[in-house]
């Protein structure tokens, strides 16, 4: 929307980064920008955005993503986009398997995704779960969002425990703060209340989240060093 008002992609990103840096100065946090290509947009528009964002990789931008309607726009149609990202050393995650298709997860892995957004569809695909575990591909779980989009029918059928026991690196996320009206604490507590998440799991999930993040090594080390006192 902002580009339609005359702003350049780099200007938009730099403005967002200014806000994030202001938050970092006030709060004890680290931030990074994940730019997101959209499935419903044409290849030229998405690729142009990635090329502009790549100029700011390491200066606010940490990686890229692909989101949108998986059924209407399957991941197989975005090979060129992620070949470019891979060749230009731009880390990426791909929303995959939020709907019922495991094929989009498989394709994302073939493209070289370091993380999978949601991945719910592989809950009944043990070979795919094993592949994610073996390749240490992080899966971004978003319980509230998955309930709202009906990726699952109830929290009782959420595959957190199944993924955990399969050895898949996972992070617990909000997906979005405002649309779902949730926080990371709320998401953890939803799993606790469902009897899925135990305190003993905390360090493993925390460390898996940190390892799968696109933060640079210095940030990861700084956050890691604080674990014993948190």
Spans of model-derived segments:
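Short acidic/histidine-rich active-site segments
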Residues: 93-99, 168-183
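Short, acidic/polar
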Residues: 42-53, 99-106
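Active-site loop-helix segments enriched in His/Asp/Glu that coordinate
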Residues: 1-35, 39-44
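Mid-to-C-terminal alpha-helical segments outside catalytic/metal-binding sites
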Residues: 196-230
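Acidic (Asp/Glu)-rich catalytic clusters
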Residues: 17-28, 51-59, 82-86, 128-134
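Flexible glycine/proline-rich, aromatic-decorated loop/lid segments
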Residues: 155-165, 179-181, 187
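Active-site core of metal-dependent hydrolases
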Residues: 62-151
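Charged helix-capping and loop-helix junction motifs
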Residues: 10-14, 47-51, 76-83, 153-162
